[in-house]
Amino acid sequence: MSSKIKGLLKARGPIKKIGVIGMGYVGIPAAVLFADAPEFDYVYGFQRDSKTSGYKIDMLNAGESPLKGEEPGLDELIKKVTGNAESDGDGKSSGKSVGRKKFECTSDFSRLSECDAITLAIQTPFKSREDLIPDFTPLIMGLRNAGRYLTPGTLVVLESTITPGTTEGMAREILEEESGLVAGVDFCLAHAPERVMVGRLLRNIREHDRIVGGIKSYGADGALPDGMDSPSTKRAMELYGPVLTKGELIPMSATAAEVTKTAENTFRDLQIAAANQLALYCEAMGINFYDVRRGVNSLKGEGITRAMLWPGAGVGGHCLTKDTYHLERGVKIVNTELGLNAGTKDSRMSPEPLDFPEGKESLYVLARQINDFMPHHMFTLTKSALRRAGKVLEGPENEIKIALLGWAFLANSDDARDTPAEIYYRLCKDAGADISIHDPHVLSYPGLDEGDTISQDFDGVIAGADVIAVLAGHKEYLTLKPEEVAKRVGVKCPVIVDGRNVIDPDMWIEAGFIYKGIGRGDKNVHRLILSGQHISKSPEMKS
């Protein structure tokens, strides 16, 4: 360890005060878990006081979570660490505040200068996926704020999913420029990617293994080892150790940590794409994907892994929809920069150029395209079902009403970031359909046409609907009774299109619905049942 950073960390002592920049799905649970750990004295949550998100400041300081949907334990923990919990010791309200206040949300970024450790949990979307151009604007703003108030011996950790090479590159440069300090010499810098899923945020942070990758430090003889021997890695492990209950710390280099996060999400996206493609094949062959899945997954034995995932109406969320492109961009950037840096203090063994089949598209990008296609397939199923009902979605005489159930991309959540429901909505709107949207958790969304809203009135949304399209697997949709829904819909030959495998096809077919479902080739062309009469399939009726 360089003598300077060693002395700075020794003088600073253990991490006691933490700043978390970004109060969203990642930053809020991380901040309150830090605050709940006895090893730490105080935590600041930093949030811009903007028109769109400034409301979070007052809510959090009042002990309220701005995140909707089901998040076990989060509401209670926020109340506890903000000093707003009320209990008489038996779990009953006494009207008295219990618990020491250890967390505060603020828009005053100058308080970063008080912190021993600063984490950044800020979204990193893409401006152009085709050209591999990310939108790092919010992250850059956060880094500039951190750098502006950075003091010697502070640890800075990027939790955001980022293009490999960002920590050692852009992040390091901005922090050094703003602070006048040198990373690895005057302050520590690491990447510790979040690995959370909405609906189980606290559990994921506590129980998942934590990847921790610090940058290199420099001594008199040049670069010192990175990975677990890096002082930045060791300091970051000190930060995350107290919040883990089952998870272990896994040290590595900063770039390896970046690749780990982008690769694990890319691989999951690839697995989902494999299930989606097989579901399309099963539809085309008139068989049930779920029978095939059960059969494939039944193969067990030493060294055998056949954990096929579920198909669906599309992949959403902030991570899987873009992390493939971070990985694709990263291999180009890191490979190039390592070659250019040969002979400098940053030099390592210059890598070979990427060797890949000429003219062939990345398997990962193709998988991403398949998953992006699935809401388009939902639209195709919708049109096909309407034709069986003698109705046409597209055309000048179109008066089709569609009830879209579930705007969130994830079941029982309010997270609608990059939701595939928006693609389906836009396709139907462009075809001239009238769309009503129901979601028990998502209250509003900025991308809707003027006059369109998201309602929590289920009966009002489905009334008069020619089509019910299920885009999210909320628990409220699992117990729907088809006979009751048919009465509320009140149209002849109602259609239901199941994009999340949440309903029993036979029950809905028996109730008179025309059914379509992803992967249900065995049911997508069924006998129509109208007023108790079975109507045989015919060439005109076949989808």
Where are the predicted features?
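Structural/interface elements that position substrates and couple domains in central-metabolism enzymes
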Residues: 1-543
